[in-house]
């Protein structure tokens, strides 16, 4: 076929077709039928315009031999065959000079006599099927469509064929000749069958045998065959009479399609109630680290050794007291638990050799905090299916909570830069293939933008805590093991640093199923005074445990140091995902890559370097009540990363539901912005599905409030 194309068509046409295919990443040597189709289409476009001129009186005329004295202007502007950028430039300039409406898709020709764009189609199938597909795709009254087939049939908008008989006959004869030539070489059948529908992604594979019979049996009334039904569906014009068409189809269907206009959508209703509270497994912006630089002590890298070394850097310990009690808990037990940790760490130091792990004594306060013997005994269903009053124990409906400002502050903080680097370059994974040169360049640029980001610190902290907790849960099932919360980073000068955020004590952990829960008590250092936003700390009991000297611009100031204590729980599956939080880096890198790809395809070259190094350019980050927020490419990287990290830290069924359902509304709104005139049915049901996920989760509530900002600005 490739040889045939090169013999049969003018070299200029062949060259243009090759260029067009390369632009879309296709290979003329492999996709030979497509190669032939593009050449045929180009030739028809050129023949359509050949010999047609407009004379000085503005009349259309046909001139076959060139008369050098005639003042003639080409009747048709050829758009097909130019590269995309040039083609759009031509279309724009035509629209500007003639006032014709700009088409959504690139047409093939412009007719200066009739003042309209023309879409030329060449099909190996039925002309009316192809015509319907074209019309359905371009959805424009203004663009004229003219379809030719290889069998000599043609079809045009309003049966207006634009050209005279003879010019059209020339085109039909040429198409017939191409068909004969292909047939004589045994190429026609494959070429005829290879035609895809207009821009429809799914392959039209043939349905045969039983499936075909079933398909024919299950057609709606009034359709004789599957082909007949397909043609009807392809030409389905959403122009207000959908309801009528639906009612023909089935007695069961009674959806009313409502047009979706700028005034249609309302904001999402966020719940009322007390403000939502912090529910992450560890503190985020409020965390405080005790750190050692360039650790070189004995046993460096063993968590317990590192933790003791970090504890020794602080000298301001004092007698702990409760500053914000937990509403429901036995607060003195939390206080006793912290005192026990201090005492047992002291005991370790008095021993000759520090052990690698530390199991806490099973005191009454720890048994209480870790819910020892509290959970109802789990019994195998087989052993109790005969029990008459078997039931699931009651659980309360969750209480609705309102959005609180702290979660937006948490998110803003997560996007900020810290003064340490939390990942090395290879954290995102190595190249697999040599072709990955561009990929590694992108990865390195991206890593440079996010390595100092606070969200990256949260990733490493999350990975560490979940790994340590899962290890201990498997290795010391019955023990109340003390697990230091540690992270490692590098300072600006490249010095290594080990940080201690606090401790976890894990409860009994006989985890048979993925969802079996292990309880733990977390105790985390902080300088945040809980009395500023008490609602955020509903689940915590907070102690004041020391005073810390801080260097500030005005000299040294002493600030109280707090310990945030709470009981919490997690499961094997949650810890497994927590250990894989580095995936967030990959997810946000891929989002950035798709932005670069989009730029590169417009500019027809790889834009990675310009993308990251052009510091003056700003990019859209997201909607806020103030409007569209913009920022540097680094800010975009960090914001995308923070979103991905928060999806992991605040993962919940509410988030799953909200993401899935709100996406549907988002797509409709985007269709409206793109002037695609969307229609909807049961919009109320969609709102209900979205709003039933807005209960009490801070991250979901924040996303819903962002969604409302987006709606406001999108529909202005």
Curated annotation (Swiss-Prot):
It comes from the Viruses. It is found in: Host cytoplasm; Host nucleus. Its main location: host cell. A motif (Nuclear localization signal 1 (NLS1)) lies at residues 124-139. Belongs to the influenza viruses PA family. Plays an essential role in viral RNA transcription and replication by forming the heterotrimeric polymerase complex together with PB1 and PB2 subunits. The complex transcribes viral mRNAs by using a unique mechanism called cap-snatching. It consists in the hijacking and cleavage of host capped pre-mRNAs. These short capped RNAs are then used as primers for viral mRNAs. The PB2 subunit is responsible for the binding of the 5' cap of cellular pre-mRNAs which are subsequently cleaved after 10-13 nucleotides by the PA subunit that carries the endonuclease activity. This is Polymerase acidic protein. It comes from Influenza A virus (strain A/Chicken/Hong Kong/715.5/2001 H5N1 genotype E).
